[in-house]
Amino acid sequence: MEVEQVLNGLMWKHANEPEFLQAVKEVLISIQDVYNQHPEFEKAKIIERLTEPERVIMFRVPWTDDDGDVHVNTGYRVQFNSAIGPYKGGLRFHPSVNLSIMKFLGFEQTFKNALTTLPMGGAKGGSDFSIRGRSDAEVMRFCQSFMQELYHYIGPDEDVPAGDIGVGGREIGFLFGQYKKLTQQFQGVLTGKGMEYGGSILRPEATGFGALYFVNQMLQTRDIDIKGKTVVVSGFGNVAWGAVKKATLLGAKVITISGPDGYIYDPEGISGEKNEYMLELRASGEDICAPYADEFKGSKFIPGRKPWEQKADIYLTCATQNELNGDDADLILSHKPLCIAEVSNMGCTAEAVEKFVNARQLFAPGKAVNAGGVATSGLEMTQNSMRLHWSSDEVDEKLHYIMHSIHGQCTKYGTQKDGYIDYVKGANVAGFMKVANAMMAQGIV
């Protein structure tokens, strides 16, 4: 069956799952040429199997608030593919969470993990619970109830969740504590843990650090030095924090961060104590970035707008999926940028991606450029299994090597006849080939 026929069937079958279909369509269009060169893939129905999760777990999560009132949320764990290793992927606590988003993230995670060179399958999970405005005690009770069901399906050699939006160090601690109590085992069943109980150094910064290593590699393909370049960043969570920190260390100047309320423009650059203040804003639970302008003179808060209107050399999406649309892409292209990177998962709409690629713009897709987070999670798994702890320099060196390797895979499969590197195609084909070959070797399962 041709790729187009498979895609049409999926669009009919999953018509109510737009995010999942968007992710699947991007991958299938990218890999159709290489897929057609392998008739054995079609015979084994690789695409049909690859686009269907191995397991979808949905469950209720009852919990009580501080007033004693009962609430019920929905929990998810989509175990998408385990062909190259145990399931691996984050947990997201946010009101927007639904099955379509969990499936899209699990599908993307499968290819992202394949690119890291580490033995990790793809999964994603979470709940439509919001931590905003909730006390520590309420968050703890929710996490304990969530783990009460999830623990049946995870383990260090089965499925190893991590954090994501709404799930930081506090939540991972509560989840791990409940898992330990239920199983009476101290295992590396979660990553993103605190340093005191099996966590890896640099894990909070890893996604942002890895993204800048990848962006730097992209710029070097055109003999461009990142030093002195201006950077527009969206978001103000861990991903943005890590990206700002590493961009500054590499000699670039970050001039924006953003939140649901608008964005901050700081022409003097966001670094040092300004960058650390971002974490205070995020920890406040208010989900707004406006207070930054009150804290630091010379900066300006622009309410209700996106940071893409600012002219810069490099643009990084670090907030959430589909935050950058076609109109935003036109605006960015009018600034004549050097590079755009999708540091958030599927941070750009399909229309935006198409515009960047058609313009022959240096564009990094999320599954490649933001793989540093899960790569460092994989390094945490390794440290837990070996019962040892690596230094900051050791972890950073391994992360740098992994991102360099991912960039190499993208250029191998994405370089076009005219010399343009289509990183979207390169990442998709590289990830697909590894997973497909593993599935072929393991039979029809």
Tell me the role of every PLM-derived stretch.
Residues 40-69:
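Structured beta-strand/loop patches that form or line metal/cofactor-binding pockets in enzymes
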Residues 2-23, 218, 333-445:
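Adenosine-phosphate binding glycine-rich loop
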